[in-house]
A protein has these predicted regions:
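Physicochemical signature of membrane-embedded alpha-helices that form the seven-helix bundle of GPCRs
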Residues: 7-10, 78, 106
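Early transmembrane hairpin module of multi-pass membrane proteins
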Residues: 1-24, 28-32
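Membrane-interface transmembrane-helix boundary segments in multi-pass integral membrane proteins
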Residues: 125-155
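Conserved small/polar residues in nucleotide/adenosyl-binding loops
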Residues: 156-163
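Hydrophobic alpha-helical membrane-insertion segments
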Residues: 103-119
Length: 163
């Protein structure tokens, strides 16, 4: 849980940043935003893969299989495909302006998947439990587990010390 949940949070936040910055880049043509989104994408893909793999490991004893076509798992796989599409568009399309336009459109469409991932456990009957941590209202997770979880999420995103 201490690896899986923060990795999933970061993967969602990373793609949200990519999508929003890509939309701004599509409208305002700010080249620095392209560099930022291209830098975030591989990291977000890595965290998405970590979330999927650790979720499979976590789910095996509970569900009896490493993979189930659950709504949240499937939508996370779709998120990984959006990350891959975003990355490969920049790698394969030689015209930078065209690559930016296409990848911005892909990212904007991928943004639709973020609330699907978040609310899939509430909208459909899934194998995943409902959210244990709530911004509004009381969380169902004990503070002795919440603090390490938030600390690991913070450590995932903190810069490494310089040598």
């Amino acid at each position: 849980m201490y690896v899986h949940v923060p990795a999933a949070w970061i993967s969602l936040a990373s793609f949200s940043c990519i999508a929003l910055l890509s939309i701004f880049n599509f409208i305002f043509k700010i080249k620095h935003l392209t560099l930022i989104t291209k830098s975030i994408a591989p990291i977000g893909l890595m965290f998405t893969c970590i979330a999927i793999v650790t979720g499979s490991i976590w789910g095996r004893p509970t569900w009896g299989t490493f993979w189930a076509w659950d709504a949240r798992i499937s939508s996370m796989l779709i998120l990984a495909l959006f990350y891959l599409a975003f990355i490969f568009i920049h790698k394969l399309v030689s015209d930078e302006d065209r690559a930016n336009k296409i990848s911005s459109i892909v990212a904007a469409f991928g943004l639709i998947n973020i609330p699907i991932i978040k609310y899939s456990v509430e909208w459909w009957s899934t194998l995943h439990q409902p959210a244990s941590i709530k911004i509004t209202g009381s969380s169902s997770i004990h503070s002795s587990m919440l603090m390490p979880l938030l600390l690991i999420c913070l450590l995932y995103t903190s810069p490494s010390p310089r040598d």
